[in-house]
């Protein structure tokens, strides 16, 4: 049995559960305030905790796997093994100041104050650029700190930029890009189960935005279809019993290319075209 730590709330909670479900690991929401929940896989349970606590819990072996943001992994400084970029929860950690501020670069903040929920990252950043600032740790509403006179600048997450605009803030610099990651305890002993989770999630990510296109095509035009359907390692070709003139061809195609591929395939004489969604794809 392994434990997967998942954010109990916030922007990573729902996407994490949906991704696990797509990977065949359906999660039962815990009753009341229960910390853990069973899954559809008898070898896996889920622990619901604060996203910021997950790196440490995985490092200490309380959970063997975890899903949390890269920003929180860096902030915690935890010794964990990063297995996958899960491609959701994308954002930037930025240094921002009020629009009317004279600050144009980090150096202009020398001797000033910076509010943030990421004191370790911010402190290291300013040390690296050789700027002396006072770091003020906050636990939320970072964007209002300059307006109420608490800080000259902030270091905060920015996904769409809307919050910065609403609070009349502008970006001075970008500290890092973040997204949700699958992390593991380096000393975890349940290697087979961990690898199963890894391959299932990777298969879902590989299948995102792709379809399987199948069709019967004239044998004499097979080379043209090879160019039309490159696939992952080239299209797969199968014989059709009792038909010497046609062969079956199928390949993985990007969703945005499907309409064009189908149209071109019809022009080349394809018949019986089928487009199927792909749940998982493991090379």
Curated annotation (Swiss-Prot):
Pathway(s) where this gene product acts: Amino-acid biosynthesis; L-histidine biosynthesis; L-histidine from 5-phospho-alpha-D-ribose 1-diphosphate: step 1/9
Single GO MF descriptor: ATP binding
Catalytic activity: 1-(5-phospho-beta-D-ribosyl)-ATP + diphosphate = 5-phospho-alpha-D-ribose 1-diphosphate + ATP
Ways its activity is controlled: Feedback inhibited by histidine.
Gene Ontology terms describing biological process: L-histidine biosynthetic process
Pfam families: HisG, HisG_C
PROSITE patterns: ATP_P_PHORIBOSYLTR
Top-level taxonomic group: Archaea
UniProt-listed InterPro entries: ATP-PRT_HisG_long, ATP_PRibTrfase_cat, ATP_PRibTrfase_CS, ATP_PRibTrfase_HisG, HisG_C, N-reg_PII-like_a/b, N-reg_PII/ATP_PRibTrfase_C
Entry's Gene Ontology cellular component terms: cytoplasm
Disulfide bonds: none
Essential cofactor(s): Mg(2+)
Protein location: Cytoplasm
Keywords per UniProt: Amino-acid biosynthesis, ATP-binding, Cytoplasm, Glycosyltransferase, Histidine biosynthesis, Magnesium, Metal-binding, Nucleotide-binding, Transferase
EC primary class: transferase
EC numbers on record: 2.4.2.17
Family label: Belongs to the ATP phosphoribosyltransferase family. Long subfamily.
PANTHER family from the UniProt entry: ATP PHOSPHORIBOSYLTRANSFERASE, ATP PHOSPHORIBOSYLTRANSFERASE ATP-PRTASE
Family annotation (HAMAP family): HisG_Long
Function: Catalyzes the condensation of ATP and 5-phosphoribose 1-diphosphate to form N'-(5'-phosphoribosyl)-ATP (PR-ATP). Has a crucial role in the pathway because the rate of histidine biosynthesis seems to be controlled primarily by regulation of HisG enzymatic activity.
Name of the protein: ATP phosphoribosyltransferase
Gene from which the chain derives: hisG
